[in-house]
Amino acid sequence: MSKVLVLKTTAQADEVSNSVALTNRFLEEYKKFNPDDEIIIVDLNKDEVGTSILTSETSSTFYQQEVTKKYINLLKSVDKLVIACPMYNFSTPVTLKSFIDHVSVANETFSYKYSKKGDVIGLITNLKAQILGVQGAPLGWYPWGQHTQYVEGAMRFLGIDFNKTVLLAGVKVAPLLQLTPEQRVETIIDEVIEAARTF
């Protein structure tokens, strides 16, 4: 049995959120393959980790906060991580960026200390991640808006392996615009099922 941490990051209400619909459908399929796994869902909008941001005013104490320790320990205690990753203004939600800031701590989750080549050594090697991306534009419209690649890179930096990212793209233009979030997810259901099977 695996422990699976699921991070909700959307800034929208659940009933209109494409990333919530995608995450729910993924979990539905995942449970078919892994019925005994423990699922832990955390809504970063409702947790301090999603609202405590790194600024010049907070930088001196940011990494000493209990919330930082809590989430590093949580990452070390689970086997799998599911990240709902919608795009807002060509980037990740601020809640997800704040989470990544909180758990990216030198000598806790990554290190250069023992590297022979001077590159980073990720210290969270117990985890496999599944990124579930959503964006309004079709894939390739805005090459600078590669939000899922940023999250993949951040996971790799921390030593986390990941399954092939699932991306639901083009939700704000026809033909997907006219559909409900659940109907949009059905347009990529084969990818969702395959990700659930291999995760």
From Swiss-Prot:
Per the record, the domain of life is Bacteria
List the EC numbers from the record. 1.6.5.-, 1.7.1.17
Alphabetically ordered keywords of this record: Flavoprotein, FMN, NAD, Oxidoreductase
Q: Which cofactor does it need?
A: FMN
Gene3D superfamilies named among the record's database cross-references? 3.40.50.360
What GO MF annotations does this protein's record show? electron transfer activity; FMN binding; oxidoreductase activity, acting on NAD(P)H as acceptor; oxidoreductase activity, acting on NAD(P)H, quinone or similar compound as acceptor
EC top class named in words: oxidoreductase
Q: Which residues bind FMN?
A: 17-19, 87-90
According to its UniProt entry, the function of this protein is described as:
Quinone reductase that provides resistance to thiol-specific stress caused by electrophilic quinones. Also exhibits azoreductase activity. Catalyzes the reductive cleavage of the azo bond in aromatic azo compounds to the corresponding amines.
Q: Which family does it belong to?
A: Belongs to the azoreductase type 1 family.
Q: Under what name is this protein listed?
A: FMN-dependent NADH:quinone oxidoreductase
Q: What is the lineage of its organism?
A: Bacteria, Bacillati, Mycoplasmatota, Mollicutes, Mycoplasmataceae
